[in-house]
Every structure is written in structure tokens, then in C-alpha cells.
Amino acid sequence: ARALAPLNELMQGSKAMQQHVLISGASGLIGSALSTHLAGLGFAIHRLERDNSAARFNYSSASKHVSLDHSIFLSAVINLAGPSIADGRWTASRKQELLESRVDITTALATALAAAPKPPALFLSASAVGFYGESTLPLSEEAPAGGGYLASLATRWEAATGPARRAGIATAHLRFGVVLSTKGGVLGKLM
């Protein structure tokens, strides 16, 4: 909720003009629920398509490039792209896929936003609570990165937002833990 506060501020600050939000990973568990919620609040939602050159907002996995429709001013961009970390065994190739799928699209998106003639005010990018590694101590969001695979993945994923941050776009990392939902994810596996 705290990370979405800037979106609420955007909405409150401009009732006269509809705010446009781009979401990567909009078809995923979190992205689909967030899209519905934000649309209900009055935001115009745009999806970052994958490998669809006809789309207004497209990510080419071959060239690792994001194309943006600059005729639409985006107030915010929310990056939720990447396959579920809970699906499948963590083989060496799966770990590489999880890393590349997150870092590549985040880098491409942050680079495209930084180069936009009128960049968004806000870039929210998914990350993972695994950033902190394993610890029995209470941690705050100011705690440094821990050790291990998830911490390394999250650190590199967050670093990929650098081009947007350096361009002056307010950037926040959403360090998700286990997502529980009756619509998918790990909950069904636990029941």
C-alpha cells in the first residue's frame, strides 16, 4: 500500500485528466488484479506486450528492446514481468531463466523510460523479499542485501532500474514475499 501511495497522489492531483499507467506482467496473478483495481479507480491501463511489433507498448525478447507509444503520456509504469519463481525446480537453467527474464526486461524498460521525451513521474518495479537473504533478525527495508541466489537475483533485478533512476524518475522496488491468492500461485499447492 505504501508503494502505491504515489499513484494515489497522482490521481488526486489531476482529477481533470485521466492518468495512464503501463504495466508489464499485466496478465500475471498480481498484474491482472492490479490492472482491475487501478482501472476501477479511473486509471487508463496499458499493457506491455511481448514480441508484438504492432502493439503500442512492446518488448522484443530478441533485441531486448522496449518500444513506447510517446503519444500517450504515462504517469506511472509498473514492472511485474517475469515467470513465477514458485513454478518448477530451481535447476541451473531455471535459475538463469528467472534471472534473465527479470533483468533483461527491467533494463530495457528502464532504458526506454529514461529516453522518453516526457518520462513518467513514477516507476515501480517488482523485486523479492529474498533480497535480504535468510535471517532470524527483524529487518527493515533499509537493511543491506543478504547472501544466496534470491538475494543475488533481487540485487541484480533492482540494479536494472538504474537508467530510470538516473534520469530522475522516482523509482521504487516492490519486494514481494509469497503471494497468496485463490486465483493462482502457491496457495493452491499448499491446500
PLM regions and their residue ranges:
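Conserved glycine-rich Rossmann-like NAD(P)H-binding loop of the short-chain dehydrogenase/reductase
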Residues: 43-50
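SDR active-site strand-loop-helix element
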Residues: 24, 48, 80, 123-129, ...
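Conserved Rossmann-fold NAD(P)-dependent oxidoreductase catalytic core, especially the SDR/UDP-sugar
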Residues: 107-148
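NAD(P)H-binding glycine-rich loop region in Rossmannoid oxidoreductase-like domains
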Residues: 58-106
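Conserved beta-loop-beta element that borders a ligand/cofactor-binding pocket
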Residues: 127, 159-182
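N-terminal Rossmann NAD(P)H-binding glycine-rich loop of SDR-like oxidoreductase domains
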Residues: 21-39
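Short-chain dehydrogenase/reductase
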Residues: 99-103, 143-158, 180
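Anionic-ligand binding region
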Residues: 183-191
